[in-house]
Curated annotation (Swiss-Prot):
Protein name according to UniProt: Cytochrome c oxidase subunit 1
Binding site for Na(+): 41, 46, 441
Chain ranges on the Mitochondrial intermembrane side, renumbered to this chain: 42-51, 119-141, 213-227, 287-298, 358-370, 434-446
Cofactor note: Binds 2 heme A groups non-covalently per subunit.
Quaternary structure, from the entry: Component of the cytochrome c oxidase (complex IV, CIV), a multisubunit enzyme composed of 14 subunits. The complex is composed of a catalytic core of 3 subunits MT-CO1, MT-CO2 and MT-CO3, encoded in the mitochondrial DNA, and 11 supernumerary subunits COX4I, COX5A, COX5B, COX6A, COX6B, COX6C, COX7A, COX7B, COX7C, COX8 and NDUFA4, which are encoded in the nuclear genome.
Organism name: Gallus gallus
Keywords, ordered alphabetically: Calcium, Copper, Electron transport, Heme, Iron, Magnesium, Membrane, Metal-binding, Mitochondrion, Mitochondrion inner membrane, Respiratory chain, Sodium, Translocase, Transmembrane, Transmembrane helix, Transport
């Protein structure tokens, strides 16, 4: 098989998963570089880069790159493609060529996003792209239009979602019920359903924005009978499910890692875990306006969105305590994936607690658009999603490559990263409570201390990213082969060896169901 046939025209779920992982890693480094520019600007009062426009272009690009080109490609595209067919005993994905197209839509989409930063003044709108700031007066030129066209990544996600839903429902062995599939498979299924239902609404919203900018429509312009609040509703009806799309596959991975390294044959409360994820997926669609408490909604509307948002804490709590129950009484192996998983449980819970604070509409009036919100979502993303990715990466790296990571360096990497992200984001809670607003490139001197500490933390995190690159290089360089994975009876993805052959389950697996 030629290089081009294997990697450009690939129809193999393992190869496409590998492409997603490489692309996501590359994008993650780009996103990290952007975040360091942000923290460099904020390390001391005064300007470093120039005006607020260039700063906001960097902030916007940082968000888009991390969400659409790092977390989603790695979790759903990388781990999802690699593991879902192996875990359900399918020969491949349901639509292998569409799978390839889903991947190859991402690099052009990424180029469109980068192009938006290089023309005119760039798209300094924030990732929410609210009009009128994103309209053709405040942002004349092609920047925002190019940023809108990077919705191509959304097309990729919709195609991927269709593929995963079809694969998971239709390509299991007949004897296997949906309630016998591993939790990671469930998490990807629910994530795919969320993508399929939410992305078209975003498409509608940004298409209206595109026509407002270029074809003189007035969907979001009061002068023509439109309403900018309509855009916020459309955007957040996608935007809130999106944050659950980012974390749900992480929940699935953490369930596998915790059970494996606690020496358990299954996670505690399988059905509770499944229904908790289903509940989170459902509730994620009916809380979107908690992002909009500052736009003057009726008191009864605010009361509803406050209480509905708090209800999400219940299924989330079920998951957290089920992970703790899985750990309980186990023989814990303190391997790097376990460290990441424990870090995830602890820090994700802290992020969840600040989320409960922000759910209160009255408190949110004071905290909205301050660094408290930034601290909240970076605790659940930078220490939830990213820690889950690193837990999954360190756990399944031997499966993907056949090589093992250096154990002590990987643990050291965890220590550096843990220190870095906490030093970066914990002080931001204090900044937010003291009223420092988001999306400004400068600040009063009173905020200097915590900003300086936060920026030092970002440099430590950068060191961790460089360490990770070195650790991966070292693994391929040293070529320590995997001898024998443990617990293969309950972890079907390992049964073909490390790495598995190019084609697995070429004939349907025989499943014996215990009566």
């Amino acid at each position: 098989m030629t290089f081009i046939n294997r990697w450009l025209f690939s129809t193999n779920h393992k190869d496409i998963g590998t492409l997603y992982l490489i692309f996501g890693t590359w994008a993650g480094m780009a996103g990290t570089a952007l975040s360091l520019l942000i923290r460099a600007e904020l390390g001391q009062p005064g300007t470093l880069l120039g005006d607020d426009q260039i700063y906001n272009v960097i902030v916007t690009a940082h968000a888009f790159v991390m969400i659409f080109f790092m977390v989603m490609p790695i979790m759903i595209g990388g781990f999802g493609n690699w593991l879902v067919p192996l875990m359900i005993g399918a020969p491949d994905m349901a639509f292998p060529r569409m799978n390839n197209m889903s991947f190859w839509l991402l690099p052009p989409s990424f180029l469109l996003l980068l192009a938006s930063s290089t023309v005119e003044a760039g798209a300094g709108t924030g990732w929410t792209v609210y009009p009128p700031l994103a309209g053709n007066l405040a942002h004349a030129g092609a920047s925002v239009d190019l940023a809108i066209f990077h919705y191509l990544a959304g097309v990729s996600s919709i195609l991927g979602a269709i593929n995963f839903i079809t694969t998971i429902i239709n390509m299991k062995p007949p004897a296997l019920s949906q309630y016998q599939t591993p939790l990671f498979v469930w998490s990807v299924l629910i994530t795919a359903i969320l993508l399929l239902l939410s992305l078209p609404v975003l498409a509608a919203g940004i298409t209206m924005l595109l026509t407002d900018r270029n074809l003189n429509t007035t969907f979001f312009d009061p002068a023509g009978g439109g309403d900018p609040i309509l855009y916020q509703h459309l955007f957040w009806f996608f935007g809130h499910p999106e944050v659950y799309i980012l974390i749900l596959p992480g929940f699935g991975m953490i369930s596998h890692v915790v059970a494996y390294y606690a020496g358990k044959k299954e996670p505690f409360g399988y059905m509770g875990m499944v229904w908790a994820m289903l509940s989170i997926g459902f509730l994620g669609f009916i809380v979107w306006a908690h992002h909009m408490f500052t736009v003057r909604m009726d008191v009864d509307t605010r009361a509803y969105f406050t209480s509905a948002t708090m209800i999400i804490a219940i299924p989330t709590g079920i998951k957290v305590f089920s992970w703790l129950a899985t750990l309980h009484g186990g023989t814990i192996k303190w391997d790097p994936p376990m460290l990441w998983a424990l870090g995830f449980i602890f820090l994700f819970t802290i992020g969840g607690l600040t989320g409960i604070v922000l759910a209160n509409s009255s408190l949110d009036i004071a905290l909205h658009d301050t660094y408290y919100v930034v601290a909240h979502f970076h605790y659940v993303l930078s220490m939830g999603a990213v820690f889950a990715i690193l837990a999954g990466f360190t756990h399944w790296f031997p499966l993907f490559t056949g090589f093992t990571l250096h154990p002590s360096w990987t643990k050291a990497h965890f220590g550096v990263m843990f220190t870095g992200v906490n030093l970066t984001f914990f002080p931001q809670h204090f900044l937010g409570l003291a009223g420092m607003p988001r999306r400004y490139s400068d600040y009063p001197d009173a905020y200097t201390l915590w900003n300086t500490l936060s920026s030092i933390g970002s440099l430590i995190s950068m060191t961790a990213v460089i360490m990770l690159m070195f650790i991966v290089w070292e693994a391929f360089s040293a070529k320590r082969k995997v001898l024998q994975p443990e617990l293969t009876a309950t972890n079907i993805e390992w049964i073909h060896g490390c790495p598995p052959p190019y084609h697995t389950f070429e004939e349907p697996a025989f499943v014996q169901v215990q009566e």
